[in-house]
UniProtKB/Swiss-Prot annotation:
N-terminal signal peptide: 1-21
Any one GO molecular-function label of the UniProt entry: structural constituent of egg chorion
Described function: This protein is one of many from the eggshell of the silk moth.
Region described as Left arm: 22-55
GO cellular component, one term: egg chorion
Highest taxon, organism lineage: Eukaryota
Protein name according to UniProt: Chorion class CA protein ERA.5
Pfam families in the cross-refs: Chorion_1
UniProt region (Right arm), positions on chain: 104-119
Keywords: Repeat, Signal
Gene Ontology BP terms: chorion-containing eggshell formation
Family: Belongs to the chorion protein family.
Source taxonomy: Eukaryota, Metazoa, Ecdysozoa, Arthropoda, Hexapoda
Keyword Repeat attached: yes
Organism: Bombyx mori (Silk moth)
Amino acid sequence: MSTYTFVLFCLQICLIQNVYSQCLGRVGPGGPPVGPYGGPLGGPGYGPVGYGGCGGYGGSGIGNVAVAGELPVAGSSAVMGQVPVIGAVEFAGPACAVGSVSISGACGPTCGCGGSPYY
């Protein structure tokens, strides 16, 4: 096996691990009865032991995006499918704009939170 093939193989393994490790929720890979026991296998979260039976990363986080300046934008955008983004939109300052913004979302059934859609 060449070096290039080996590097591509390792990259694919990392990508597959990233895809299938995001939406386990609070119960872990073993289901609700044994989920807390699998948490420390994810490595220490905060401190010397696992953080409350949870792995190091559960697929959610906090991100901030700031945009300043003039934004001459026209048109429409449509996103369909599963988009792993949870967030909010905030407008501050004077904004001469016409149009509407709609944000809706829900946690999928496999995420373990069981939340209903919010608008």
